Amino acid sequence: MAREQYVSQVQLLVRSLPYIGEEKAFALKGGTAINLFYRDLPRLSVDIDLTYLPVKPREESLWDIDETLDRIGSNISQHLRGAKIRRIAGGGGNETRLEVSQGATVIKVETSPVARGSVHPVDVRTVSEKVEDEFGFAAMQILSFEDLFGGKLHAAVDRQHPRDLFDVKLLYANEGFTDALFRTFLIYVASSGRPPHELLAPSITDIEATFRQEFEGMTVEPVKLEDLLEVRRRGYSPTFVTSWMFTRERFSCRYTTVNPISTLSDFRKPRAFQR
């Protein structure tokens, strides 16, 4: 996709954020939270991923999500000239996504009806200075650093999408892989719909076509496919895999206990990431 199209999507995304931010049941997560709020726009991000924060029974949560998305869609269509809203199916067949279009530009707003709540308290942040200069101001509830990047690490091993690998690349280059982050990542693994062993020792997938079609043109600085493959290789190096395997065995045993989440406090990051 051409960079111009990505830019127009970010413009629509930033214009939509104030109406989403009014709903305190949601916090922003994923690439948009990382690259527009936490970092100074190293890459463009074109979807709005939300975490539903209240921890309530499933049916009550689904009803509230439905009502809240309706309010968001109504506010956007009323305040953004030419904006059109369409509810579309998300996880589990529920209509937990909004498609927001303005002319030829389309973005998606979505939340998971399954993965609800956060591990750590949320923050209220404003977009970075560069984002404000180029696209305008926005402020919103954002997941904590550990939740943001714990979820991002989970996405990286689950999907191996170039966007996720790029975000992990900058994590390695900046904050690094802390014990608190690793424990939060394990909680996301435990909450996943996939078996933990598949995420702690994933199979390699071919990402070249996805890189060309869904990533090239998004970053400020040019990024080669090999750069992202190196991030993945680092994660699957012999030292790292050995550490993962040890962690996986301990984690799998702990996960069968009555209260698995409370047993994660003594887990440490793999030795490959010790500084």
Question: What does each model-found stretch correspond to?
Answer:
Residues 1-275:
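Compositionally biased terminal segments of proteins
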